[in-house]
Amino acid sequence: MSRFFVSGYPSDSSSEEEDLLSSSEEELLSSESEEDNFSSDSEFGNDSDNDSSDSDSDGAPSGPTYFLKKDFMKGSGDGSDSDSDDEGRKVVKSAKDKLLDDMRDSIESINTAKRVGNWTNILAEFEKLGRLLIKVGQQKIGTPNFYVKCLANLEDYINETVTNEKESTKKMNATYSRAFNTVRQRVKKQIKEYQSHMDLFRTKPELFETEEPLEGIASTIAGAPQLNGDEDSNAFTSVGAKTFSPIFTTLKQISETRGKKNIDKVEQIQTLEDLLNDTSSTGTPFELISIYQMLLSIRFDASSNQSFMPIDQWKKNEADLNSFLQLLKSKSKEYQVSELGTVTDDIDIEPPANADGVKVVFGSIASLIERLDDEFTRSLQYSDPHSIEYIQRLKDESIIYKLIVKGQLYVESTTPVEIRSKHEAGQLFRIVMRRLEHIHYKPNQLIAANETEAWKNIDTNVDSTIVPRNSDPNDLVVGLADFLTQNAKSIYGKNALLCSIYYYAINNQYVKARDLFLSSHIYSTIHNSESSLQVMYNRALVQLGLSAFKAGVIEESHQALNEIANSQRLKELLGQGFNSKYPSQATTAEKQKLLPFHMHINLELLECVFMTSSLLIEIPAMAAVSSSSKDSKRKASLKSFKSKLDFHERQYFTGPPESIKDHVVHSSIALQKGDWAKAYKLLSSIKIWKLIPDNEQLLSMMKKQLQVEGLRTYIFTYKSIYTKLSIAKLSAIFDIEKESVYSIIDKMIQPGDISGSIDESKSFVNFTTNDHQRTKLQELAIVMNEKVGLLTEKNEKTASNGYSRKQPMQQQQQQQQQQQQQKEQKELLHEENNRFRYANVNANNDEFQTTA
């Protein structure tokens, strides 16, 4: 057999079948090789094979396959004598020896890479070494001594590299730097896991020079007699692994399995609940704090794959969170839980005490309360809003509000005053924002009731430094919003500002809400904000328009509601549903963006208010347009409202009004004829007005507005017929006092809406007809004249290569001034229009709409 092919098949590259040979097979092979040097290399050799191999070896090799290795040929059992002599005895390694040899090879590769500073290779080999170490643990071999030595040497080399990098002017390249940082972190983690081994190596390195397993060394050091079997492994565990108390042993086991697949979280929760019950009276405060934090977190994790947290688990978490806060309050001079705390190396290590002697444990009360509140909101989102279950669930809102107030008081006590305006106070900002979100949409009476209930079980000597107890609702909202606006980062400040606007608007403080909205200029930056803030902005804008209507400021109400009420995505813009897709097609993330039903703005009320304000504005405007010769080219500002009237007029038969739209259209037709009483009767019969508190006051305001706008419509419509009108008669027709009629007509005369005057006795209004009433032919001739003028100017520009005739310098300056004035007017008009433009909710990230 050719020596070239034989040497190409070393024992190190043997197959996995060789690694899995049993000890009996190894002994059989070694005995056979000792008894007969000319026996076959095959593990299946027997007497008949030996006979055949002897006979086969007599002949010379022949045939096209004579050079192939006989071990791989079916039925071959002979081995070349010369090859066996040259190669020596074949060594078959066990799986254990091969695994340890692979680890030694990886360590040698790491040492080679260390000499040249190749951190990429070090990282690759260290990862390979880690995988081999896992196999070592699976086969219960024990931690090899050379692995501990490798960790120690690698730690020393890392520290040396760090020192050299600080002193050297030439920095490590980016690839090596990333690999170095990764190796540094993983070595640190491994050293932490094998800390007892490392300490032993640092004190007595000579013990690790032998190949003896560490179990024997550990038992010798411990002064215990050498044991065999399972007792020996237990002796190693006592020295090699860190000893935990029974409580922290359980917590450590649960912590290591969190996030892994096929873990029974219900069993973990039950284990922690039993542990809490057993140690509630005997455990140390630090043990109880650790149990509470893990139990609350795992309960939340258990419901992460569900639509919402089961109500029984939610109530358990709420009760445990209250107990947790009570524990922290009773041990406030010894322990605190805060995001400003120090993270310890292990779960059972207590943090060092600060200057006041308090140990600050790392944790977040604010995050736990936020998560509980989010689960409460999710349960409302997935419940039928018209069911009894929704009403029963909504009663828990007062429970979560109590918890938020308690949490705010605790976080205030653990957050130093000097950092409240910094980023470190984020937990305080978040919980204050939660409190504001729970009250900003409620009327004052309900806020006062919630506050009374929340402070009932809190000690009288405990008070908030942000907003003191027993503050009235207005001071409460202002105090919370001012704290966030002045101290927190922009997102909390903007959200607090919008909550304040919404609160003022819903509690009939329209002037404050409008001034705050306009002075903040939030409308200029809202389009770059996140979706939740844009939804809050749209809600505040709608509530501002409704408040303006209730205050009788019809034009501002119409201006605020104009764009958003005509939008095809009204539900999406307000976070109340989906217009562009069916609810079943919405993703979970999209559903979670929606608001619970009890926070919704009634869309029918919004439509009714907008159409009523459009009626009060557009009917007089259309009458003025149709009767004015000067403004004959002016169009009504709202085509959609006029189109509703035109559509109604084209119908052959119209029944009595049924919907809100029908009532408003019939009321508009009556108002066009000056019949304000019929218009009021139709509008007041709409049942949606009963949803507004003090609706009698609202209907009284609407009656006055209809009387005034009916008077103006009547004058615009019939001014060309009358030359004189009695103010007393107008007062009787529209049920308005004479002084009010005189004031209304005077306001129409001054800007030139009508041509006329009031006599000295203030009894009559005289209409003048100085303006010649143009015929239809004359109006068409005027329009044609304007178009001919434009055509002439275009022809002149064409004849002069795009330039018009040169005008005198003075005329050019006048035109420039006019253009500048027009530009300024357009900018002012554009800014005015943008003030009440709704935010197009998250059009970039496609969170609310199907097309981005």
Curated annotation (Swiss-Prot):
It is found in: Cytoplasm. SUPFAM superfamilies: Winged helix' DNA-binding domain. GO terms for biological process: formation of cytoplasmic translation initiation complex. Residues 14-57 have a biased composition (Acidic residues). Keywords: Cytoplasm, Initiation factor, Protein biosynthesis. SMART domains: PINT. Residues 823-835 have a biased composition (Basic and acidic residues). Residues 597-772 form the PCI domain. Residues 810-822 have a biased composition (Low complexity). InterPro entries: EIF3C, EIF3C_N_dom, PCI_dom, WH-like_DNA-bd_sf, WH_DNA-bd_sf. GO terms for cellular component: cytoplasmic stress granule; eukaryotic 43S preinitiation complex; eukaryotic 48S preinitiation complex; eukaryotic translation initiation factor 3 complex, eIF3e; eukaryotic translation initiation factor 3 complex, eIF3m; multi-eIF complex; proteasome regulatory particle, lid subcomplex. It holds the Pfam family PCI. Residues 798-809, 841-852 have a biased composition (Polar residues). Residues 1-90, 798-852 are annotated as: Disordered. Its main location: cytoplasm. One of its GO terms (molecular function) is translation initiation factor binding. HAMAP family: eIF3c. Component of the eukaryotic translation initiation factor 3 (eIF-3) complex, which is involved in protein synthesis of a specialized repertoire of mRNAs and, together with other initiation factors, stimulates binding of mRNA and methionyl-tRNAi to the 40S ribosome. The eIF-3 complex specifically targets and initiates translation of a subset of mRNAs involved in cell proliferation. PANTHER family: EUKARYOTIC TRANSLATION INITATION FACTOR 3, SUBUNIT 8 EIF3S8 -RELATED, EUKARYOTIC TRANSLATION INITIATION FACTOR 3 SUBUNIT C-RELATED. Component of the eukaryotic translation initiation factor 3 (eIF-3) complex. Belongs to the eIF-3 subunit C family. This is Eukaryotic translation initiation factor 3 subunit C.
